[in-house]
Structure formats: C-alpha cells, structure tokens
C-alpha cells in the first residue's frame, strides 16, 4: 500500500524531488513529500523538457513534510531549517524514519552538498535495501542512504566533486600520518597517536571508498638540486578496490623514490643530505645576564611532567613541550655550567636544566622548537599527495581551491632516513554503530599499514602500503538500541563514573552516568611499543620559514621577559605567533571568519592547549579530568580548561 502510494505520488525524474519515508511502530502507512510554497511555482508538473527545469533543494522556498506514524499533520521544515534546527537528537526522536537529511556540523558541508545528497537519498518500503550491483549503502551518522553508482547521475557527479577529494585526502594523509605516529611512539606522547585516529573520519572514508574507481594510478615527478647534484623525486600512488560479500577493501600503495640523475646514479644518498639545523643555530639567542638558577640537575620547579622518575620520553601527560618558550645555555652559573647544561623555560616561568651532551636532550632540544613546524610540514606533504590524487581523478586541476605547492624533497628525505629497513605493520580498527532503527550491528573499518625501504644502484625507494577493509558484522549484544557505550581500555579508567555492563577480553561496555553521547569509535589494542622512543630527525625537515617561526617565538619570549608582559601588547612590538597566523602561513590558506572554526579544529589535533583567541602556547595543567566531564556549549567551539577539552574532543571525534 505504501509502495503504491509512493509510486502514484512520484513526480517526473527531471525535477529530482525527494521523498522522505517513515514508518510507524505497527503497519500504519506513512509517507513524506517535498513541496514548493504557494506562489513560487505553479502546482502543475514541471515542463517536459528535462533540461529546462532544475530543482534546487537548498532553495529557501522548498520545504519537506515528514509524516510519522498515524499522525495526519506533517512536520514542515525547509532544508535550511532541517540543517540548522534539527539536531541529531531531534532527528533520532523520529525513531522510525528510514532516511532523512544528514546533518553535518562540519561547516565545510554546504547546503549544496546536502542538496546533492537529497537528489538520491530516497528509500522505499524495502527497509532501505540497496542493490549491490547498482547502489552503495553509505552511512552518515545514524542514517543509511542508498547511493546509485551510475556515473551519469547528476547528484552522484556533484557529490563526488565535493566528497571524494575530502575522503581520499583524509584516507591517505591520515593513514600515513597514523603509521608514522604509531611507529615513532606517538612522537614522545602516549596519547598523541589518537589524534591521528581522529583525523580519519570513517564515515567520510566509507563514502570515498564507495565512489573511488576500481583502479587508479598517479605519478608525480619533480627535479631538484642538492648543492650541485641533480636529483629527482618521484611520487607514485596506486589504488585498487576490491568488493566482497562482507564489504569492500581499498589498497593504496604510496611510493617515494629519490633518484640521482647525474653521475650514473652513484652515491644517490647525496640527494637526501639537506643542510641540517644544528643546536647552535637554535640556541644562538643566549642570555647575556645570568639571572637563572637551576638548583641541580633535572629538578623541575612546580611542574610534575618532568620529574626524573618520569622522563619526557615516557611521560604520562600530553606533550610536555607544549608551553616551552625559551631554550638557552646559562652563562657563569654554578648549578648549570656553561656548555654542559641547557635550560628549558616554560610560559609560566618554570625552568629546569639538562645535560647538553645527552642524546635525549639533543632530541628534545630539536623537537621542542622544531616539532610543530616539522609535524605540520609532514602532514602537509601527505595532504598534498592526497589532494593531487583527488584532483587528478576528478579533473579539478586548475579550478579554484586546487592550487598545491610542490612537494618538499627534504621531508621525503627525512622519512627515508627515519623509517626502519624492515617492513613494519600497524593494525587499527574503527567500530561504527549502525543506525538505531536497523538491527543492532557494527560496521568496522580495519586499517593496516606497512612500510618498507629498498636501495637500488641509482635510487632509494620508500613504500607505504595501506589497506582499508570495510566490513559489516552483527552482535548478539543489543547495546546500541539501549544507548549503551563501547570503549576500549587504553590505560585509563574509561568507565570512570559509569556502570560496567559487560566486559570481555579487555573490551568494556559502559553506560556513563552523566552523559548521553552517541557511540564513540573503539580502537583495537595495539602491539606493545618498546620503551625507547625513536625520533625522526626533524633537523632535515625544518624549512627556512620554520626557522623564522622559531626565531620569532624565541625573540618574542626574550623581549617579553626583558620588558614585561605589556611589551607584547605594544602596537609595533613582536608578538607570540598567533594560531590563525601560524596555520594560515603553513597551509597557505587565508583565515576568513567562516573557516576560522575549521582551522581552529585542525590546530586542536596537534595543539590541545591552544585557546581560540589566546597565544599559541597556552599554560597546561598536569592532571587528567574525568573523561565524562561535559564541556560548556555556549559557543560553537567548547572552551573547557586543558586537558579536559582535548580529552573531550578525543572521545567525540566522530562529530568532527
């Protein structure tokens, strides 16, 4: 009956109007229709000429009637109202709605994006079943839509243009960055690897995988010189997609080849020897006055993160270098002899000394000032490769917003020198809850990454292989219908202040007492990491701009201490590099008001202490709050004190 009604009401295909379907607790027939307000368009059907009529579903004059159960009064909403006023909880209150407009709080999703989704987000009374040969089942939050894979579908073409670049960029950049982060002990932080987990949006990744061609290959070549040596950087990306009964798998192989083009390729490693940044360069701003007193070696003052029993390489807190503003060698100090010790000073004024000739100190010294720039540039390399790939696939080269700078061979060189010889593999698992109106199920994304290096007569080859497998699996534990929460044990009592409902092999099913959030993704237990941390040689990747950043920060910090805090407020005085300036310069983006929120979120992935309108380096606290501490919601960007905000973001990264 409902099917017949829908067939009778369905307008010509050319108008591309959307039917939003719902069903009640029993067998009551329901339907949903889209209308234009009276006076805008005649009530007659659109003209027969299919090319002369286009329905824009982001038009303010279009509204949707949603019928629920036996209620004959529809809920009328325009698309903009649906996006702005329909929260996820309000949508979920409909319970039996099969498919409706997905809400994406990410400001990069425009009304046009959602309009394209609406062009084919149509379900019938077959429980939103999707034909494998012609449609892909894609989940957006708690919504399942059936996406036709026909290349000549206008909605699919538009959707590909907007979603696919984002998805492939996240897949490639996140997987490479995730692999490096896990491989190198999360760059000295036991928690920072989870920031890379949050970088990959599984739902967007699933969409990109669904739209990705079955086979794709791209090769980029770039010539450069190291002194008088002629070299070439070759970046090759291959994508292979395999569909199976349980889901689909996408394999990406990213290869970096460094080739010497002269001298028959002899001594090709010369092409990887970029001028390093030595400690003397970083420490050239030395204090002339001896106003520092370090009582004795490795003693901290009022700060728990750097105790001798808990060195910075094994700290249990977030990024101990977060608020370092100055590093210098003391002069004529009996407690920290010259040329033997180095002094680290934080924004709060805390200081400590460490031996200059210790490898740990040298690594820390290089990282404390160069880590930020090196990490961003490495990430930008991954983003650049991914975006070049997406641009090639979608033929978007030359269009607005696709201009990409050349790949920095120094970063590839640093990757070559830092990665081990043998193949290493990491395995990560994302669990995504299925919509609550469907049978309780999990959709799982498995991510496997491996790295290998090969040496040839005239070149060195670095290969990073990523395998994404999307599978659907079912469980007898009806956790999702009861809004219970699944977490993995990551060294913290994640069920703190909550009730443990079920526990099996380290996996905990918890119901928080103070929270009603949707299910968060879980992470598979990782292989035990060695206690020693292998550091990338960031000296190889610090660019000239990075040196300027370091100099600016160091100079500003010194002048501020010399002249007082008011010096920073002077109109012509040096200031700490503010967040938007730092991001804008590194990513070559203009920071307008509408995308400030996006940049702020991107920064938070690596700078958990950064405040929206404060200095780049913000004071941190040394204790972890309860993971269930709820942040305020008075503004679009929560601003709880560190580290609760960062931890809250980690637990909620599905929303970003």
Curated annotation (Swiss-Prot):
Signal peptide coordinates: 1-32
Sugar attachment sites: 290, 332, 338, 359, 422, 516, 552, 652
Superkingdom: Viruses
Keywords, alphabetical: Glycoprotein, Host endoplasmic reticulum, Host-virus interaction, Late protein, Signal, Viral attachment to host cell, Viral attachment to host entry receptor, Viral envelope protein, Virion, Virus entry into host cell
Subcellular location: Virion; Host endoplasmic reticulum lumen
GO cellular component, one term: viral envelope
Described purpose of this protein according to its UniProt entry: Plays a role in virus entry by participating in host receptor binding at the cell surface.
SUBUNIT field: Interacts with isoform gQ2. The heterodimer gQ1-gQ2 associates with the glycoprotein complex gH-gL to form a tetrameric complex. The gH/gL/gQ1/gQ2 complex binds to human receptor CD46.
Name of the protein this chain belongs to: Glycoprotein Q1
Source lineage: Viruses, Duplodnaviria, Heunggongvirae, Peploviricota, Herviviricetes
